[in-house]
């Protein structure tokens, strides 16, 4: 921690400043333009490959197990967004046929795919793989692919899927002991899955890994599908790099790195988060709006967390609630910079959406931002006054400061088919949204505990839990882990049909939970310190294209 003396009003204020590392990326993403000739060439070939793949998907002279494997491969290769309607119709048919399989591998794959697409298939299909004592048969220990599919299936479980608790424990133990003796690329796939299960992974990260590290090395691979996936990944990457260049220029023009040096400079990492919410080309506008929002709220977070005084933060909170540029004169100079930038950003959003007659929806995101800032202010007051809230009071405030209610709402702004009732549904904090927010809160709190403790924070989630329950740090962290597991079950339940809104609008909520799982893996704060966790992912998704 460093100290900074700043002349403010007529007195000198000594501020505790979190010593954040500079951006890892410099200006490397500033200038990128798509090579239209290459993009056009890729797009033409993709169209032809798309038709071949569609024909393959719709072919009827094939075993059901092979159809499930084909869908799984297409999804893992990241090209399923081209065939959403076809895949949904096939899975709907399979679900309504009540098909069952004798082998664990296909049964588990069927279960996971159907659940991930919202079909509430019964976990009783696994009872045939248990002995008379209700334990999974030890003879399954040699079925590595079956175990891997069982392991992946166990992560889509809900509260009533007790059999899948046993499935997770059983498959994990056997996969861990067998992994060192497996051949490549199965060994890499199992090792990766044990560290990062598919259901909780960021889709683009999982796609890149599967294409380059697994599918390309499989003897049974389909060369046409592999080529399609590589071309599609690289073409999308061009679009993503173009978006990042646009956002990087916007960020550079704001010049926060110079004018607000106390804050984290993480616009590239913010883009990774937006890309994690949706990667498909039709969400380009939505992604750019979301990354700008994440970057801006990160500045606000650091203002509350690492710089502002009580008096300043109260004035800032009040100004945000009033949402009026005339309030700017009440703020110290450094706060004027971010306040004006925030109001300008939302004016830009309104202007951008007005051509489609949708500018009125921006108010939903503004109200959520006001909520975040109010709760940030409560947190900073607790810190300054040394208040130690009970864990229930802490959580009622801290769920909003994850920013996930706000980001979920913002993620809808650029989604062209969103309607007013979707925002109304979201504003009521439905259980699936609450689950995603809880996952973010408890995982973030666990990963950042030591750093916040070193800054003198006593109102952290882990500290509150330790005091309330009279438990050790490890026991408190275990409690938080249990909360995350419960929330994942709620989230998985919320994806099952019938759903109150279109699955298209549930996916960003699911993906926000996935991003936090990946960013804070192994209890590391990958956002504040991206070099270990996010840097390799950013290189894979935004720097290096796939060799074709």
Swiss-Prot record:
Its EC number is 4.2.3.61. Expressed in roots, but not in shoots. It is an enzyme of class 4 (lyase). One of its GO terms (biological process) is diterpenoid biosynthetic process. Coiled coil: none annotated. Mg(2+) 3 binds at residues 444, 448, 452. It holds the Pfam family Terpene_synth_C. Keywords: Cytoplasm, Lyase, Magnesium, Metal-binding, Plant defense. Binds 3 Mg(2+) ions per subunit. Belongs to the terpene synthase family. Monomer. Catalyzes the cyclization of trans,trans-farnesyl diphosphate (FPP) to the bicyclic intermediate 5-epi-aristolochene, initial step in the conversion of FPP to the sesquiterpenoid antifungal phytoalexin capsidiol. Produces germacrene A as an enzyme-bound intermediate that is not released by the enzyme, but is further cyclized to produce the bicyclic 5-epi-aristolochene. This is 5-epi-aristolochene synthase 2. It comes from Nicotiana attenuata.
């Amino acid at each position: 921690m460093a100290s900074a003396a700043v002349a403010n009003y007529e007195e000198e204020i000594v501020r505790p400043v979190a010593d954040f590392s500079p951006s890892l990326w410099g200006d490397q993403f500033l200038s990128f333009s798509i090579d239209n000739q290459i993009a056009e060439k890729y797009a033409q070939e993709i169209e032809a490959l798309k038709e071949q793949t569609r024909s393959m998907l719709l072919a009827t002279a094939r075993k059901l197990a092979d159809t499930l494997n084909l869908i799984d491969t297409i999804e893992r290769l990241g090209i399923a967004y081209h065939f959403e309607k076809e895949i949904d119709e096939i899975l709907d048919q399979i679900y309504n046929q009540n098909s069952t399989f004798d082998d664990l591998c296909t049964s588990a794959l069927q279960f996971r795919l159907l659940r991930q697409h919202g079909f509430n298939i019964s976990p009783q299909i696994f009872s045939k793989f248990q002995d008379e004592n209700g334990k999974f048969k030890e003879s399954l220990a040699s079925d590595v692919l079956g175990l891997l599919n069982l392991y992946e299936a166990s992560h889509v479980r809900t509260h009533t899927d007790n059999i899948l608790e046993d499935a997770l424990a059983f498959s994990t133990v056997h996969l861990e002991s067998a992994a060192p003796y497996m051949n490549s690329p199965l060994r890499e796939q199992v090792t990766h899955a044990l560290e990062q299960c598919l259901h909780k992974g960021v889709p683009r990260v999982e796609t890149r890994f599967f294409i380059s590290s697994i599918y390309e090395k499989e003897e049974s691979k389909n060369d046409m599908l592999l080529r399609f996936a590589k071309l599609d990944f690289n073409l999308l990457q061009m679009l993503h790099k173009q978006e990042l260049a646009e956002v990087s220029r916007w960020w550079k023009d704001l010049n926060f790195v110079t004018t607000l040096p106390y804050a984290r400079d993480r616009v590239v990492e913010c883009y990774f988060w937006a890309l994690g919410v949706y990667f498909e080309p039709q969400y380009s506008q939505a992604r750019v709006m979301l990354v700008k929002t994440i970057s801006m709220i990160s500045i606000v977070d650091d203002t509350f967390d690492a710089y502002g005084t009580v008096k300043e933060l109260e004035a800032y909170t009040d100004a945000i609630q009033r949402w009026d540029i005339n309030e700017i004169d009440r703020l110290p100079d450094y706060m004027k910079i971010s306040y004006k930038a925030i109001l300008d950003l939302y004016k830009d959003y309104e202007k951008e959406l007005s051509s489609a007659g949708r500018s009125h929806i921006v108010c939903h995101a503004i109200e959520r931002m006001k909520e975040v800032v109010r709760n940030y202010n409560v947190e900073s007051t607790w810190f300054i006054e040394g208040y130690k809230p009970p864990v229930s009071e802490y959580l009622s405030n801290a769920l909003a400061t994850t920013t996930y209610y706000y980001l979920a709402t913002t993620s809808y702004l650029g989604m062209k088919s969103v309607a007013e009732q979707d925002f109304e549904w979201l504003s009521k904090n439905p259980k699936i949204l609450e689950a995603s927010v809880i996952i973010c809160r408890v995982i973030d709190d666990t990963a950042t505990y030591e750093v916040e403790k070193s800054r003198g924070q006593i109102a952290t989630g882990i500290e509150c839990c330790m005091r309330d329950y009279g438990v050790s740090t490890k026991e408190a962290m275990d409690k938080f882990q249990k909360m995350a597991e419960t929330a994942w079950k709620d989230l998985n339940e919320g994806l099952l049909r019938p759903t109150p809104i279109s699955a298209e609008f549930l996916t960003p909520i699911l993906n926000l939970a996935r991003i936090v799982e990946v960013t804070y893996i192994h209890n590391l704060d990958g956002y504040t310190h991206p070099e270990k966790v996010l840097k390799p992912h950013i290189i894979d998704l935004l720097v290096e294209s796939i060799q074709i």
